[in-house]
Amino acid sequence: MEIGGLVYLILIITIINLSFGETNNYCKIKCRKGIHTLCKFGTSMKPNCGRNVVKAYGLTNDEKNEILKRHNDFRQNVAKGLETRGKPGPQPPAKNMNVLVWNDELAKIAQTWANQCDFNHDDCRNTAKYQVGQNIAISSTTATQFDRPSKLIKQWEDEVTEFNYKVGLQNSNFRKVGHYTQMVWGKTKEIGCGSIKYIEDNWYTHYLVCNYGPGGNDFNQPIYERK
């Protein structure tokens, strides 16, 4: 389903309790480098954050819906040509911007990686269905409460201020705009995220990992079809 028409559907998440480890041998999944996250760390979902005091890991239903709605609202805004920021702006409207739906398998892989408290991208996160893209964000505050997912996602959205749609995505600008371009990659259909919240030296830290299928961010390719 695509954004850009008059009908915009917000999909309510249904959580399905699946054991993906029983149906997929992740150790056989090929990536450009490295061992698959679920092969390397298993599916126990236990956090591994050293001496940090973990307060929560995993996402609530409300947080999942918040993440999904935030992505689709932003994608809709871009697709309609309403995103005025950029170098230059506004961003051109799109005709192939899919409405994202939640994918529990992508979320399980993302959660397993978030649980490692490693603030780099994992090497291998593909599924049998998708080559998977990824966005990560972290926020720390002394306000004795954790930032909402939307505040972390805003970091990705704001990269649009550095994006030149006339140039597109290149190796030279990837570090500045790669989170934004993955968020609005037109052909991406599904998303699944993981989260961990912990306290380190009185800093309330929230680490968010989102996986996207199919992934985007192919250099020298349009991020979406323009109207």
From Swiss-Prot:
Keywords tagged on the record: Allergen, Disulfide bond, Secreted, Signal
What SUPFAM superfamilies does this protein map onto? PR-1-like (SSF55797)
Q: Which GO terms describe its cellular component?
A: extracellular region
Query: Subcellular localization, per the record?
Result: Secreted
Pfam families per UniProt: CAP
- Report if keyword Signal is assigned: yes
Task: Tell me the tissue specificity.
Answer: Expressed by the venom gland.
Matches recorded under InterPro entries: Allrgn_V5/Tpx1_CS, CAP_dom, CAP_sf, CRISP-related, V5_allergen-like
| Membrane-traversing stretches | none
Can you give the residue ranges of the SCP domain? 68-212
Name by which UniProt lists this protein: Venom allergen 5.01
